[in-house]
Amino acid sequence: MLVGTSSNTIFAKEIEKNNEIPAVKVFNKENNIWNSKYFRIPSMQTLSDGSIIAFSDIRYNGPNDHGYIDIGCARSVDGGKTWGDYKIVMENDRKDSTYSRVMDSTTVVTNTGRIILLAGSWNKDGNWAMTTSTLREDWSVQMVYSDDNGETWSKKVDLTTNSSKIKNQRSNTIGWLCGVGSGIVMDDGTIVMPAQIALKENNVNNYYSTIIYSKDNGETWTMGNKVPDLKTSENMVIELDGALIMSSRNDSTGYRSAYISHDLGETWKVYEPLNTKVSTGKGSGCQGSFIKVTNSNGHRIGLISAPKNTKGGYIRDNITVYMIDFDDLSKGIKELGIPYPKDGNNLGGGYSCLSFKNGHLGIAYEADGSIEYKDITSYYLSIN
């Protein structure tokens, strides 16, 4: 069932109209402590004490991916109504005043309460996957963590120049970074982070979605294998009956791809109930968020946020939230609402991150160079 039917659209509009959900600026390009001109790439976690912590690229000089970038965070203790406690959680290497950057954060909260953040790091110009034909020498993946709910953060830990930290990295790797957004902790305690990897294959640079996982609270990581389709990249995963289900960006089909693994990413196959069911329009694909919740009937629900991109290119308009009922797949994919019913900024927009805890659902999303938050618990309550 392809989303976007008239009945689903009417349903979503009714939710939006009836609730008139206010948007709150978390990172404001017009007014911020860093004098940053642009913010991108939201990640968000709701903590055990009910506070919400949001993360963003601090793109000091503008939207460009290849610029001077740090990663910052903000906290809300009132359900997202107000935000404060702004701080930098990961600095770039300070090697190049134009190009040094850490960016595209992915976060997870472990069973011990540790918040882990992983990000890609570079110090030269150029695309992460296409600029070099061999392992890129200025690239690394860095990790920081907090054991006090984000009040203080560790120094950076380099995962990629120390082979004891990351296992099963392919010899033909150009580079990799995490999938952008959030990871999960499986029922057995395994931490799984979405990832994307660029590989040299038959003298061509290709990129794919994958995962990394840790069984020791993030001390060491193992890389899974790539999904079957190239031009997949940013993704998020959920656990269902011990399997991993992935919803992934795809830059060639105009739809989000979906895969399932029953062996912790060793092998993947297409997950038909979700594959190519969410349209992302003509042109480049886009990052999207994917989380699992349980509704009042006890059904396990997958929630996806992604732009419709009806205007094509990099406009990435109408960031929309969809649902799939894993316990009643006959329902197909339904549209729940459109938290950002506007055009994106074609210089950088369309990304989002969902977070759910204790019956409260929130979304952080890109809004013309700022990051906004909405409490969309009404979407969750509408699921039946």
Task: Set out the residue ranges of the language-model regions.
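Sec-dependent signal peptide cleavage junction
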Residues: 2-17
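Asp-box/BNR beta-propeller blade signature and adjacent active/binding-site loops
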Residues: 15-384
